Amino acid sequence: DLKGIYYIPRIIKASKLGDAAILKEIIKILAQNKIKTENSLKFNPELILKKGNYSKIKPNKQDKLDIKKAIKTLKSLGQYNFSQGVVVRNNKVVSIEGIGGTKKMLQKSKSNKFKNHGVLVKFPKKKQDLRVDLPTIGLETLKQSKTAGLKGIIVKNKQHVFLDKMKCINFANKNRMFISVIWKRFLY
């Protein structure tokens, strides 16, 4: 209807600040029209994995060091509300997700030297609205991680969308990769 035209300037203005700002502006507009925004996972709980490991391979000691380094890096970037993904290999940050997204980050992370070594940690940004904007992992992410030479993917409990769950688990098992969901106790 024509009422939507009224809001276009606000959305265009928000677009200059990025996709998170667009979503926040849309949520404000909906609230002004007495429409409540619900968490999308409330209606699709099958899209999340609960805490734990989802493949036969589990993170080893080096993987856990890489995971901790990645989490520390994401926390330090949190003040800038900049990135939701980081790749760490041998306790060194290899790449940080930027405007190009996860695919671009994983392309930059490719290693001919290392195979099945290193991790992708993908957490929401500090100011991300988790009702409508969650990090998403799917089969393509796993394939790109494998191509980059990574061993595993880590997401945060109840703060992600996981597509094609069984295909991803089967792919991880076949390629000796891990998929792990961590919870608050692990983070600190």
Residue ranges of predicted features:
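Conserved mixed alpha/beta catalytic, RNA-binding, or beta-rich assembly cores of soluble enzyme
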Residues: 1-7, 16-20, 31-146, 155, ...
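Charged, glycine-enriched surface loops/patches
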Residues: 10
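C-terminal binding/interaction regions
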Residues: 143-188
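Short Gly/Thr/Asp-enriched flexible loops that form oxyanion-binding sites at enzyme active sites
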Residues: 1-4, 27, 164-169
